[in-house]
Amino acid sequence: XXDATFEIKKXDL
């Protein structure tokens, strides 16, 4: 996807 922040947040969880 184009949402890099979403991927980072998911990993942060």
UniProtKB/Swiss-Prot annotation:
GO terms for cellular component: mitochondrial matrix; pyruvate dehydrogenase complex. GO terms for molecular function: metal ion binding; pyruvate dehydrogenase (acetyl-transferring) activity. It is an enzyme of class 1 (oxidoreductase). Phosphorylation by PDK family kinases inactivates the enzyme; it is reactivated by dephosphorylation. Keywords: Carbohydrate metabolism, Glucose metabolism, Magnesium, Metal-binding, Mitochondrion, Oxidoreductase, Phosphoprotein, Pyruvate, Thiamine pyrophosphate, Tricarboxylic acid cycle. Its EC number is 1.2.4.1. GO terms for biological process: glucose metabolic process; pyruvate decarboxylation to acetyl-CoA; tricarboxylic acid cycle. Pyruvate dehydrogenase activity is inhibited by phosphorylation of PDHA1; it is reactivated by dephosphorylation. Its main location: mitochondrion. The keyword Nucleotide-binding does not apply. Its cofactor is thiamine diphosphate; Mg(2+). It catalyses: N(6)-[(R)-lipoyl]-L-lysyl-[protein] + pyruvate + H(+) = N(6)-[(R)-S(8)-acetyldihydrolipoyl]-L-lysyl-[protein] + CO2. Heterotetramer of two PDHA1 and two PDHB subunits. The heterotetramer interacts with DLAT, and is part of the multimeric pyruvate dehydrogenase complex that contains multiple copies of pyruvate dehydrogenase (E1), dihydrolipoamide acetyltransferase (DLAT, E2) and lipoamide dehydrogenase (DLD, E3). These subunits are bound to an inner core composed of about 48 DLAT and 12 PDHX molecules. The pyruvate dehydrogenase complex catalyzes the overall conversion of pyruvate to acetyl-CoA and CO(2), and thereby links the glycolytic pathway to the tricarboxylic cycle. This is Pyruvate dehydrogenase E1 component subunit alpha, somatic form. It comes from Canis lupus familiaris (Dog).
